[in-house]
UniProtKB/Swiss-Prot annotation:
Source organism: Mesorhizobium japonicum (strain LMG 29417 / CECT 9101 / MAFF 303099) (Mesorhizobium loti (strain MAFF 303099))
One GO biological process term: L-histidine biosynthetic process
Keyword Ribonucleoprotein (UniProt): no
Assigned protein family: Belongs to the class-II pyridoxal-phosphate-dependent aminotransferase family. Histidinol-phosphate aminotransferase subfamily.
GO molecular function per UniProt: histidinol-phosphate transaminase activity; pyridoxal phosphate binding
The protein's name: Histidinol-phosphate aminotransferase 1
Quaternary structure note: Homodimer.
Cofactor(s) named in the record: pyridoxal 5'-phosphate
Pfam families membership: Aminotran_1_2
Length: 367
């Protein structure tokens, strides 16, 4: 009998399986803690807008019918909110779905992709699946983004520049000035893809979304956003891309799976988008708690990366998986990082005040 690995392309065997971490159920079954703080996936502790409750009560019809495959109403709302044309908006089953769509549409065997490192693993995995090589630009020793190295890398004319800003898992970010310098160095042959999954948590500081700068440029570009984080819809899987060239958006639509944004997700995203008051509350809480948790970690002697996300990345000074195992026994789920060179680092999500207190108490027990 043929081996399963003989039936698939060689590229399929190269990425490691995605590590989503343990679920609450798995932690309860394995460790039986008195309570659990789930701080490993950067979820929103306040949840979605309260207006979704009314929508859910009327949801039976949405379950029965196919959704609008084009997501017209949601795309119109997104376009209006961000100041773009409806023909520039593409929907995805989470923004990582769009990472797959873009990679399948654009990348060819032998192409190169420049990305930041450490990275959201799927930034590399989808490129690898398409037979492209990945050029990593590692952060500085202080865990800030090395803009000069990024500029040098894009001058080699890669097929794609793909990075998150703020950066996942580190939390660091490009200032408007550094972002502009990087984009100046990119040729017209390179597709710029900026993953702004955490942009809502960063706005108002010295962070700048790439959108205003990209709008002034003729280069091909896509900015990805998600409803999973600040909007609190991680379980429904809904994200979107803003594409500079409507023709490119139309071509990506040919690669996208039909009905990739389900009806409930589209309706929930519309409600979440309209509730600006709830979004402001979510962001304010995350920023306040992030400042407090960062201060406490530093006071304990940990090196903590600067962050504009709803998470912190810190050096636990030991094997991160063993460290995270100790926290699991106390009922706290964090994300031990496993990429080479960063396996002593942990990413902890900013939760509710009670969850953050639970994390700090558990951490104190380990020290």
């Amino acid at each position: 009998m043929s081996k399963a690995s003989d039936m698939v392309r060689t590229e399929v065997t190269r990425p490691s399986p995605y590590n989503s971490g343990l679920t609450i159920t798995e932690v309860m079954q394995r460790y039986a803690p008195a309570r659990i703080a789930k701080l490993g996936s950067n979820e929103n502790p306040l949840g979605p807008s309260p207006t979704l409750a009314t929508m859910l009560q009327a949801g039976a019809e949405m379950f029965r019918l196919y959704p609008d495959p084009a997501g017209r109403e949601l795309r119109q709302a997104i376009a209006a909110k961000y100041g773009f044309g409806e023909d520039q908006i593409i929907l995805g089953n989470g923004s990582e779905d769009l990472l797959s769509v873009i990679s399948r549409a654009v990348l060819r065997p032998g192409d190169s992709v420049v990305t930041l490192y450490p990275s959201f693993p799927l930034h590399e995995d989808y490129a690898t699946l398409m037979g492209a090589s990945v050029k990593r630009v590692t952060v500085n020793d202080d865990l800030t983004i090395n803009a000069d190295a990024l500029i040098d890398a894009v001058r080699e004319r890669p097929r794609m520049l793909l990075f998150s800003n703020p950066m996942n898992p580190v939390g660091s970010w490009l200032s408007a000035g550094d972002l502009s310098k990087v984009l100046d160095a990119v040729s017209d042959e390179t597709l710029i893809v900026v993953d702004e999954a955490y942009a809502e948590y960063a706005e108002g500081d010295d962070y700048a979304s790439s959108l205003p700068d990209l709008c002034e440029r003729d280069q091909p570009w896509i900015v990805l956003r998600t409803f999973s984080k600040a909007f609190g819809l991680a379980g429904l899987r809904i994200g979107f891309g803003i594409v500079g060239d409507p023709e490119l958006r139309a071509l990506l639509d040919r690669v996208r799976t039909p009905f990739n944004a389900n009806g409930m997700a589209q309706a929930a995203a519309l409600a979440a988008l309209a509730d600006e008051e709830h979004l402001a509350k979510v962001v304010a809480l995350a920023k306040a708690e992030r400042t407090q948790v960062e201060s406490l970690l530093r006071n304990m002697g940990f090196d903590v990366a600067p962050s504009r996300g709803n998470f912190l990345f810190f050096n636990c000074r030991q094997n991160a998986s063993a460290f995270a195992e100790g926290l699991l026994r106390e009922g706290v789920i964090v994300k031990p990082w496993k990429q080479e060179g960063f396996d002593s680092y942990v990413r902890v999500s900013i939760g509710s005040p009670a969850e953050n207190d639970h994390f700090m108490a558990a951490l104190s027990q380990l020290l």
